[in-house]
Amino acid sequence: MPGSRVIESTSRTSRKVKLSLMGPAFIAAIGYIDPGNFATNIQSGAAYGYTLLWVVVWANLMAMLIQLLSAKLGIATGKNLAEHIRDRFPRPAVWAYWVQAEIIAMATDLAEFIGAAIGFKLLLGVSLLEGAILTAIATFLILMLQQRGQKPLEMVIGGLLLFVAAAYIVELVFSQPELSALAKGMAMPSLPTSDAVLLAAGVLGATIMPHVIYLHSSLTQHEGSHTRAERYSATKVDVAIAMTIAGFVNLAMMATAAAAFHFSGNQDIADLDKAYLTLEPLLGKAAAVIFGLSLVAAGLSSTVVGTLAGQVVMQGFVRFHIPLWVRRSVTMLPSFIVILSGMDPTRVLVLSQVVLSFGIALALVPLLSFTGNRELMGTMVNGKWVQRIGQLIVVLVVSLNMYLLIDTMSGI
């Protein structure tokens, strides 16, 4: 029938459009599986088994909404979050925003860079400094893809995300978690002790990444040849798929740690080195190697994304541009200083997350304000319920990060 052929052709064209527009959310999703997430999820699973899996589920749902709002801002207005702040805030506030955003980007990169270096160290038996040099070389090579446009970089970052997801499918097979207990942990909220509250705050509070909010609105702001409706429709699919994969990885990390460590009497696993060394005798060499490879993949991809985010905030806030290789060189200096000074890398990783917490409200509040502004967003303005849920997320995430900040600073 001619009519059915037209409908089939239209449907096929729509799928091709969606496919061509997918990618930005995969770059953003990398921020949710960085080495900081590895450390928090492993510690939570080792200490409390499957009990805190529900926190990962809810944190991921919140992150989905936040990333969708960020992407929608770029689509609806053709400007990213940093540019909107620049255009609407007083100049002193804009400069203050830029400085804090750069500090946040560097603090985030510190955790990601050192995480990848630890991965190389564990896999190859090299020193942490040699691991850092390998990380620097690898990130420079990945960033060179940016010269060929956004798509090749999206494909590589997306490939690394899928690799980490595949690695954790294998880890789940090795660790064989108890499915009924796993499902119960995902569905039933429980906080058995005050330490569990702190770990839950760590899982949830470290979920929303300020630099990725800035970056996602930039990745979707360029119009191309597609309509806003087509782009937003594709973006919803993009965010749903990418963030679901990131959520699965976080769930798998915690479930693997629960199955491998908690129920074997290793509840005190608190750092990445110990997790790797404990995995080998429990689950075999292959499981430990896969863990190391996934840590390297997550660290490399997230540190590249952090570099791109830093470029976006600089261009957006102060209209200043430097070559990516210069930015990469500058932002990895703190990591080398930490390594050369002999500081505990896991401790530095935790402290970097505290610094990051300062920037969360500063990114979320204007994002919610702009996407709830009908004059700015037109027909793509947030609905009443989306706005209320967004406000609730802001209050919750900021409160948890302040709680984490106070607790961490009191322990120093």
From Swiss-Prot:
Q: Which GO biological process categories is it annotated with?
A: iron ion transmembrane transport
Q: Which domain of life is it from?
A: Bacteria
**Which family does the entry's similarity section mention?**
Belongs to the NRAMP family.
Topology versus the membrane:
Multi-pass membrane protein
Keyword Transmembrane applies: yes
Q: Where in the cell is it found?
A: Cell inner membrane
Q: Which gene encodes it?
A: mntH
Q: Does the keyword Plastid apply?
A: no
Its recorded name reads Divalent metal cation transporter MntH
InterPro entries (UniProt xref): NRAMP_fam
Q: What does this protein do?
A: H(+)-stimulated, divalent metal cation uptake system.
UniProt keyword terms in alphabetical order: Cell inner membrane, Cell membrane, Ion transport, Membrane, Symport, Transmembrane, Transmembrane helix, Transport
Q: Where are the transmembrane segments?
A: 19-39, 46-66, 98-118, 122-142, 155-175, 196-216, 241-261, 286-306, 348-368, 392-412
User: What terms describe the molecular function in GO for this protein?
Assistant: cadmium ion transmembrane transporter activity; manganese ion transmembrane transporter activity; metal ion binding; symporter activity
Gene Ontology cellular component list: plasma membrane
